[in-house]
Structure formats: C-alpha cells, structure tokens
Design a protein with these regions (language model features):
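Glycine-rich phosphate-binding loop of ATP-dependent small-molecule kinases
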Residues: 1-190
C-alpha cells in the first residue's frame, strides 16, 4: 500500500501517518523530517534547507526529488509507504510519477486532510505552547506564510491527483479518532 498524505501545516498528517504505520506495517517518508534531520546534522543540504525553511518557503524540487528517490528504493519501503509532505508542487508530482513508473511502483490513494486556517493557527499555537520540544516553524507568522505557500503550490497537485481519480478528502477538523476512521473507510477499497 503506497499512500500520499496531504494537508496544510498542522493538519495532523504526522499523527494519521503514525496510525497507518502501526496498522498496515508500512513506513512514513516525511520530507520535513528528512530535512530537519539534515539541519540537525549540520550537513550542507541542512544549512541550505534551514535558510529556506526559516522563511517558511519550500526547498527546491531538485533537492527533494533526489532525497525521495534515494529513500524509496530502500528495502523497508517494500511493504509500502506513506509520503508526508511530498509532492508539494505539480512538477514534483510529475517527477514522482516518473520515478515510480521507472521503479514499477504506483500510488494507491492520495488523502487530503482538509482543515481551515483559523483552526490550524489555534492547533499550532497549542502545539507550540504545550510541547517541551518546539519546532522553529511553529509560530503564527511563519505558519501563515506556510499556508499561503501550501495553497499556491500544493493545491494544483491536489487537482492533478483528482484528475487521476486518486484523491480523497477527509474532514481534518474532527477528533483524531474520527479522522482516522474516515481514512480507514477510504483504504478499505484497496
């Protein structure tokens, strides 16, 4: 089972991915986590990515595509994977399809967790205040920019997957359990 999870920052993609990982024994491929790890390690890629992410902008397609291609061929992806935070642009979606076709892999479902902006701001603020571990991008100014970038760059990707009859939209303003149940309903058709 190969899935893509979409949703604006703070929509709960990571939480839902964790549930799916445990239920289906698949792995999560999070470009955000991969990039944060590079930043933490202080690699050249990490330094470049940090300067871009600190502004709330997207890291270049070339960097992300290269990371994903290397990751997707690892043995732990054989049972399936969830892409979280990728693809974010139409070019990335097309490049992903090209990579997957070359590897004889396909995406089964694309799930969008839909949440409105006010709800996101409240959720992210709560996450930042209630956590001992803070993320540099958990503040309202950066979040607002990330939402603008998400809408501008990512919404055309949703249309792309809708045209391929792979997109399923879930109400992300429900509690975690109900969002998960709605996702499970979509996946029962696999």
């Amino acid at each position: 089972m190969n899935l893509i999870l979409f949703g604006p920052p703070g929509a709960g993609k990571g939480t839902q991915a964790e549930i799916l990982i445990n239920k289906y024994n698949i792995i999560q491929i999070s470009t955000g986590d991969m990039l944060r790890e590079e930043v933490k390690l202080g690699t050249e890629l990490g330094k470049t990515a940090k300067s871009i992410m600190d502004k709330g902008d997207l890291v270049s397609d070339e960097i992300i595509i290269s990371m994903i291609e290397k990751r997707i061929i690892k043995p732990d992806c054989k049972n399936g994977f969830i892409l979280d935070g990728f693809p974010r642009t139409l070019k990335q979606a097309i490049d992903l399809d090209n990579i997957l076709n070359k590897l004889d892999i396909h995406i089964d479902k694309v799930i969008e967790i839909n949440v409105d902006e006010d709800f996101l701001l409240k959720r992210i603020t709560k996450r930042a205040l209630g956590s001992k571990i803070t993320r540099d991008d958990d503040n309202s100014e950066i979040l607002k920019n990330r939402i603008v970038v998400y809408k501008k760059d990512t919404l055309p990707v949703l249309e792309y997957y809708k045209n391929l009859n792979k997109l399923h939209t879930i109400d992300g303003m429900q509690n975690i359990e109900d969002v998960s149940k709605d996702i499970q309903k979509v996946l029962t058709w696999l």
